[in-house]
A protein has these predicted regions:
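Conserved hydrophobic helix-helix packing surfaces used for dimerization/oligomerization
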Residues: 38-40, 148, 193
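A short, aliphatic-rich alpha-helical micro-motif
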Residues: 33, 103-107, 188
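NAD(P)+-binding Rossmann beta1-loop-alpha1 motif at the extreme N-terminus of oxidoreductases
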Residues: 30-77
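A structured beta-alpha segment of the ubiquitous adenosine-cofactor-binding alpha/beta core
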Residues: 85-110
Length: 244
């Protein structure tokens, strides 16, 4: 599936919602926060850094289609070059397993983080979102109640599009601002955390807050600037970051 990027004319109209710092975590109607289970689809630098970050405090299952990567992860060896990931896998008591079986991993997850590749073809001017949609389809088959968080790079307008395509409200978006080879470090010391959600849906706003809480819980940095906003605004923030 190819999706052509949309462009927003008036950036001044963006409405950004700041997440107020709270003493208590926000809970979803799922497991207690401490017992939340996460599945991560994709073990490139985005997916693996998120999986490593969250596995400090939660059960995380990393899903990939390459057997060699799964085998390495289950032997606490990083399949990618990242000093912090290598160190954490070797030295930290992470609650992390890897599997080729996405359906099984997603079936028991509260959150499914989608970090599948979305290659951009500059000549044809589109993102190949087929890998993202393959994950969404498998999650809908095995666990339609899971909250899916797209971390892949996507064009402006895509989250609303895919929610409509699959008639699924459980899809939100959280842009990443990571450097390759320093991805876990950038998650431990994030410049900001942004989650795009449906601001009219109280349940999804809670889901966005809870996902932001998961990221903050795993980080070393304190007082992280955290923003909850609409899907399009979050996608545009990522577009701006990539452009400038």
């Amino acid at each position: 599936m190819a999706f052509r990027p949309l462009y927003i004319g008036d950036w001044k109209e963006f409405r950004v919602f700041t997440l107020i710092n709270k003493q208590n975590q926000t809970f979803l109607n799922m497991r207690d926060f401490k017992d939340i289970k996460v599945a991560v689809a994709g073990t490139g630098y985005v997916g693996l850094s998120i999986a490593t970050l969250l596995a400090q405090h939660h059960h995380v299952t990393a899903v990939d289609v390459i057997p060699e990567k799964v085998e390495k992860l289950n032997n606490k060896i990083s399949p990618i070059q990242d000093d912090y990931i290598e160190k954490y896998l070797a030295e930290k008591p992470l609650n992390l397993v890897a599997t080729l079986n996405g359906k099984s991993a997603y079936a028991d997850a509260d959150f499914v983080v989608i970090a599948a590749p979305t290659n951009y073809d500059s000549k044809k001017n589109f993102f190949d979102t087929s890998a993202v949609e393959a994950v969404i389809e498998l999650v809908l088959q095995s666990n339609p109640n899971a909250i899916m968080v797209i971390k892949s790079t996507i064009p402006v307008g895509y989250t609303a599009y895919v929610r409509k395509k699959y008639n699924c409200s459980n899809i939100i978006f959280s842009p990443e601002f990571l450097r390759e080879s320093k991805a876990l470090y950038d998650n431990l010391y994030p410049s900001r955390i942004i989650v795009g959600t449906d601001m009219e849906d109280e349940r999804l706003v809670k889901a966005a807050n809870s996902f932001a809480d998961l990221l903050k819980e795993g980080a070393i940095k304190e007082d992280i600037n955290t923003l909850i906003m609409g899907f399009t605004e979050a996608e545009a923030v990522k577009l701006f970051a990539n452009t400038y």
